[in-house]
Design a protein with these regions (language model features):
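C-terminal segment of N-terminal export signals and the immediately downstream linker at the start
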Residues: 3-4, 24-48
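Extended glycan-interaction surfaces of carbohydrate-active proteins
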Residues: 44-84, 118-144, 191-236, 277-371, ...
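Aromatic-rich carbohydrate-recognition surfaces in CAZymes
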Residues: 83-214, 239-242, 246, 301, ...
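Inter-helical turn/loop segments and adjacent helix faces that build the functional surface
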Residues: 161-172, 252-267, 386
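Aromatic- and glycine-enriched pocket-lining scaffold segments that form the walls
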Residues: 236-259, 269
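N-terminal export signals
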Residues: 9-31
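N-terminal secretory signal peptides
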Residues: 1-9
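Short amphipathic alpha-helical coiled-coil/interface segments
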Residues: 54-57, 178, 265-283, 399
Length: 448
């Protein structure tokens, strides 16, 4: 719509006399050529809402590309009520944005999606502390170090982006920074000596207002991610945090091989396999077909949450092994694809609907039951890998339909109705990316 408006405006200018007419024709031709170069996906039908929502999503992302005070390149902000980038999601959001480059019109003086994706990684590396700690967030007000807040490993997204863009500097920077980050986590988040990763506070996992963390502070004591609160049940061994480290080590092994560091690659592979086996041995409950936190008193924190999907997100289960195949079968049938648990009309709720801790009606910013855009954005990382493409297609159709109802981009929805929580402003980057990425995937468009 915007391109057509601009073209008509230029044609009206062309009606003027002389040199103005020539200039109008020139600009009009350039604009039309640009429109022809930009790809658009095949929408589900001829309803104009699809194209309207597509253009609105692109506009949201363009508007959320801004500079933060402590880094000199524009980044893609989380948007809405979140003026910054977070370690758990910012790098992945940048990576997904980069895959949409073919649909984003270049604007003179503005960074490309791939440049933005690079900045969404390099900002964290630039603000890494001397001891190896990466910031949990880089906001307009400050960089945050009061929790670790990780889900999709930054090593994995950096490796994917470096492969996509053939960026040797990014590869080398990421390998160094993520190696130091892994060392920091071993030093400060393995206080019980188990080899698994410990959670000290709610924000470590980014699961705000989840009953998983009932009674536990949001941040670490003194806003210091090295400190666990003086609570008898803390610290906890966390399957999702451990899976993040596993995925990071797999990526570090791949980066090391690409850099010709064969012995380091082999060590990363051994370390990855060690933590993978520990996750399955210590943090999986066959009785419930669920992954749980294990507290300092040896008790599972029995809240069936989307932690299960986060473990699968890093491909912790290896289907070539009979033991892992059995776990996946049970997790999928009893939990993730169970319409009483996680396979809601709009998947995946943050807590199983038949869990006593499921929270509904849905409050704002709730990982206690709401279906979150961040969870949806992560699903293509694991569902096709485990042979669930048809189910992913269904999930994607549900999401794009829900978003297109209002042409708004919000954090979370009710898993039973598909109605978004509208307490906060629209303009949430993950939801815009979900719409664009899912429409593209459903249309079978290429990644570039």
């Amino acid at each position: 719509m915007a391109r057509r408006w601009r073209r008509r405006s230029f044609l009206r200018l062309g009606a003027m006399a002389g040199a103005a007419a020539c200039m109008g024709r020139l600009i009009s031709g350039q604009t039309e050529a640009l429109a022809q170069r930009m790809k658009t996906p095949h929408f589900p039908d001829d309803n104009p809402k699809w194209a309207k929502t597509w253009e609105a999503a692109l506009a949201v992302l363009a508007g959320n590309v801004k500079r933060v005070p402590r880094y000199d390149q524009p980044v893609l902000l989380e948007g809405a009520v979140y003026p910054g980038i977070w370690l758990e999601c910012g790098p992945l959001e940048g990576l997904v944005y980069s895959t949409l480059s073919g649909f984003v019109a270049p604007v003179e003086g503005q960074p490309t999606p791939q440049q933005v994706a690079r900045a969404n990684h390099m900002a964290f590396f630039a603000l890494q502390r001397e001891d190896g700690q990466l910031p949990a967030s880089v906001k307009m007000t400050e960089a945050g170090y009061g929790q670790i807040q990780m889900v999709v490993p930054i090593a994995a997204t950096a490796w994917e982006l470096a492969q996509q863009t053939h960026d040797d500097e990014l590869l080398r920077t990421a390998y160094s920074a993520c190696s130091r980050w892994d060392a920091w986590l071993r030093r400060y988040r393995n206080t019980r000596g188990t080899g698994l990763v410990e959670g000290f506070c709610t924000y470590d996992t980014g699961m705000d207002n989840s009953m998983r963390w009932k009674g536990i502070p949001n941040r670490c004591p003194d806003a210091d991610a090295r400190k666990s609160p003086a609570i008898a049940s803390m610290p906890r061994l966390c399957p999702d945090l451990s899976a993040t480290v596993y995925g990071g080590r797999v990526a570090l092994a791949a980066m090391a091989r690409a850099l010709g560091k064969k012995s380091e690659a082999a060590q990363w592979e051994r370390d990855a396999e060690t933590i993978r086996r520990l996750i399955l041995d210590k943090l999986y409950s066959p009785e419930d077909a669920a992954f749980y936190d294990l507290d300092a008193q040896g008790q599972f924190v029995r809240v069936r949450s989307v932690v299960i999907a986060r473990v699968l997100g890093e491909h912790v289960l290896k289907l070539e092994h009979a033991h892992d195949r059995a776990i996946f079968h049970d997790v999928w049938e009893r939990q993730l694809h169970n319409p009483r648990a996680f396979w809601a009309p709009w998947p995946f709720p943050s807590v199983a609907m038949d869990d006593p801790q499921f929270v509904r009606p849905i409050p704002r910013n709730s990982w206690g039951g709401a279906t979150q855009a961040l969870t949806a954005l992560r699903t293509p990382r694991w569902m096709p890998h485990y042979g669930k493409q048809a189910e992913l297609d269904h999930l994607m159709r549900q999401w794009v339909e829900a978003i297109s109802r209002y042409t708004e981009f919000r954090q979370q929805m009710d898993p039973l109705t598909g109605d978004f929580t509208r307490a906060d402003a629209s303009g949430y980057s993950p939801a815009a990316l979900v719409y664009l990425d899912f429409v593209r995937r459903l249309a079978g468009a290429s990644l570039a």
